[in-house]
From Swiss-Prot:
Lineage: Bacteria, Bacillati, Bacillota, Bacilli, Bacillales
Gene name of the encoded protein: spoVG
Family of the protein in this entry: Belongs to the SpoVG family.
Organism: Exiguobacterium sp. (strain ATCC BAA-1283 / AT1b)
Purpose: Could be involved in septation.
Family matches, as Pfam families: SpoVG (PF04026)
Gene3D superfamilies: Stage V sporulation protein G (3.30.1120.40)
Annotated protein name in UniProt: Putative septation protein SpoVG
Length: 99
């Protein structure tokens, strides 16, 4: 399975979340709302999740092996790092792509 496209939407908010991403797999399947987060060890990609009635966050979609997780994270973070648009106001959304 190949990641055939990555779209990044930078967010203009304070805090650890830097951007949202969508990935396309094999030109056929899209996963939205991956989050690029600034952690204590640098940037990482969090999978889309939903809060349960008990208050626990559960992934909606996620890789089932480490190799695919590394592919997703590498593609998303590479696209994010190559973006050169500075966000000046919360209404501005920028897109980056990866192919």
């Amino acid at each position: 399975m190949q990641i055939t496209d990555v779209k990044i939407r930078k967010v203009a908010t304070e805090g650890r979340m830097k951007a949202l991403a969508s990935i396309t797999l094999d030109h056929e399947f899209v996963v939205h709302d991956l989050r690029i987060i600034e952690g204590s060890s640098g940037l990482f990609v969090a999978m889309p999740s939903k809060r349960t009635p008990e208050g626990i966050f559960r992934d909606i979609a996620h890789p089932i092996n480490g190799e695919m997780r590394q592919k997703v994270e590498a593609a998303v973070l590479e696209t994010y790092s190559n973006m050169d648009v500075e966000i000046l106001d919360p209404q501005h959304v920028s897109y980056g792509t990866h192919e």
